[in-house]
Amino acid sequence: MTTETRSLYSQLPAIDRLLRDSSFLSLRDTYGHTRVVELLRQMLDEAREMIRDSQTLPAWCENWAQEVDARLTKEAQSALRPVINLTGTVLHTNLGRALQAEAAVEAVTKAMRSPVTLEYDLDDAGRGHRDRALAQLLCRITGAEDACIVNNNAAAVLLMLAATASGKEVVVSRGELVEIGGAFRIPDVMRQAGCTLHEVGTTNRTHAKDYRQAVNENTALLMKVHTSNYSIQGFTKAIDEAELVALGKELDVPVVTDLGSGSLVDLSQYGLPKEPMPQELIAAGVSLVSFSGDKLLGGPQAGIIVGKKEMIARLQSHPLKRALRADKMTLAALEATLRLYLHPEALSEKLPTLRLLTRSAEVIQIQAQRLQAPLAAHYGAEFAVQVMPCLSQIGSGSLPVDRLPSAALTFTPHDGRGSHLESLAARWRELPVPVIGRIYDGRLWLDLRCLEDEQRFLEMLLK
């Protein structure tokens, strides 16, 4: 060992001496003596390795307390961190989909802090059913006879098929054999549910006669799947639920629909593209309709099934129902969200998903122009900061071909180097509340459709 190496080793402090320093008192109070000591041992090992490999000390050896604080602060951050979603996708699956209404947040908080009547009947002090209160709300909104709640729509489809068609055939159009994110495929779900898929028609054209010819003594269901994340256009033909229900009645085969995104209001009244609604399918005579709670409905992740009482009863009594049931927090948030639909006049104000989807391009444009000047002054040496029109998307497989006019702040490096864009995006991801945009066409785009806390946004980006 050289004299220089020996000198470097001698500069490493003893853990006991570090812990006696006043700067470590608050760290021990905050993170605990055990964790602070563990980290100091780890850092000493790192320092010894650096001396051995490169004959130098880490820069943080100048201030051990500061480095320990930085590491433990980062370690203590939640894995689920709030972010500012400026990607242009309102219902971003990777960012948690629908924001919850204040009423839903309050309901969840109350449910977490206290015992609740989850499965307890106050009238007779007996055991109640956890879906009962929500079933009544859903029946009121959709016109269904009964309802069932599980933890997401994939679970809803699995339960619906397993409870009503296991060991039998389910007839589906080839054009509706969807795959959604995470390789969730209708044929795979049917196989897991114990059903046999009977494909009919072609990718682009399916007629009533195709369903009729497919029905046999082993047919359990005629199924429609809403193609919420793609669209087949051009030379196409499909039959709607009303026509399929009429055929099902003639052949004595019930019809079920996986609606996917599941809007409970006519979006066209807000200037948005219309999406099929569960209440329309119930009115058409569909026996079971499944849809998501955290997409266009604007609530928590949940799978909702509405339909005929005798069919729902089969779902409720199936063993999978217990495995897939929703917990009290989900039910509390969903109930509070559904109650907002009882007052449609205030829905676009109180439901964040609808509020964000209905923001006008003009309002977003004005916001972008207001933010452009201070950001250009701060970033102008490296980037051209401009206001540009853009198109937002709804996301989560909802209305896949429809776009919403919006406005964005774009950052274009003066030297045209893409690495500068990546570096800027990485810096913003390290902010106390990370700002998430998207890089496209040589620019970093911040679509402002979902920006509501403008002051917090500016404060962070101007530091």
Swiss-Prot record:
Its cofactor is pyridoxal 5'-phosphate. It catalyses: L-seryl-tRNA(Sec) + selenophosphate + H(+) = L-selenocysteinyl-tRNA(Sec) + phosphate. It is an enzyme of class 2 (transferase). The keyword Signal does not apply. One of its GO terms (molecular function) is L-seryl-tRNA(Sec) selenium transferase activity. The keyword Cytoplasm applies. Signal peptide: none annotated. It is found in: Cytoplasm. HAMAP family: SelA (MF_00423). This is L-seryl-tRNA(Sec) selenium transferase.
